[in-house]
Amino acid sequence: MEVRLFATLRENRGKAVRVDWYEGIDGRAVIETLGITPSAVSIYLVNGKNANPDDALSESDIVSLFPPVGGG
């Protein structure tokens, strides 16, 4: 499945990566597979919509991960 990374999550990983899909994989497993600390992900989308990282994913899903955004 395709995982799109944004901002600081791209460092040493690139804009998009492929993660091997298996039955029952969820967003938390994807984040862990990429070596990302769960607290480093602020926005989690599946196919462009807000999603729960505990929900199982489909092989054709596109996951997007965003870090916390700051500024003022």
Predicted regions and their residues:
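Ubiquitin-like/PB1-type beta-grasp interaction modules and other compact soluble beta-rich domains
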Residues: M1-G71
